[in-house]
């Protein structure tokens, strides 16, 4: 967290060690109804080629981030890529799948996650120590979605009320593409707010997560997709919608970008284990290798907020980590200089620290700092 903008930068500069470019404050109209896929607010980057990566058994990995997996696509920094995703367990969950079958699929990949991740994508120029800026340009879901909880009698720790919900429950929902909504049941409509539950780069060799097969002495052994970490992975942060940018530290050559665990809507907490789970015809991303930035943990920018992240098996520690990141960020920004005590107070007054999820073993908190508090400074 040691990047700063030049002292001569305008008062409207995106004030961060994380983000390097001039960004105007979002208008009231933008804050209320951001256009789908519109990045007019973002730094301008010349687009390169556009690529497509379809989902297949070759391009989609089930439950593990394997740094030795051969890249399925190589692109240049600034290129755009349209990625297709699968439903969990290599698309084996489909309308009509029973809870008994879901349980069998969960047991079929011991230690691994249920997630189907498309990738990896090798980004030329992305090197360890860089930051990969990932712009989420467009998300187009497929035709249906699902939500389920596993039976608490068999999985007593998976879900906030697992011990109170002994039976499993699964429900499927056709998606109304015109309304961008599903009907939960007559009288309840859920508008879609699609976002990738998992956006990841290649693993951090120092990730303390268990490795595939119980390997303990190989830092390049595959890591389960269950837990979020410094490389992103299963963050389940519902702010990662169209028009949002994610910044992730790079650990391996080429970045190695993956996405999956596609969601069509999720409440903060993801309390019963799953969101409105779906798959995407397309999630269009623009990865940009940033050599002018340094990060320890994922960082997010939306039209209206800067967002820090914190993860830990203990929810209190996850909160502490997210708050610390927010305080350090504010204390190092150059738009309105402040010390750590002032930053700490500011986060307490205006920071919105939310529980991302409590079901991924390593729990998540994200702290949202509103851009609007700096609007008077930008007008002066």
Model-derived segments and spans:
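Conserved mixed alpha/beta catalytic, RNA-binding, or beta-rich assembly cores of soluble enzyme
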Residues: 194-198, 203-205, 209, 214-315, ...
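Bacterial N-terminal signal peptides that target proteins for export
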Residues: 1-13
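Short, Lys/Arg- and Gly-enriched loop/turn segments at beta-strand edges
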Residues: 88-100, 139-150, 254-264, 356-358
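Bacterial N-terminal signal peptides
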Residues: 10-24
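N-terminal, Lys/Arg-enriched amphipathic/low-complexity engagement segments
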Residues: 36-109
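Short, structured beta-strand/loop micro-motifs enriched in basic residues and often containing a Trp
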Residues: 56-66, 110-118, 223-231
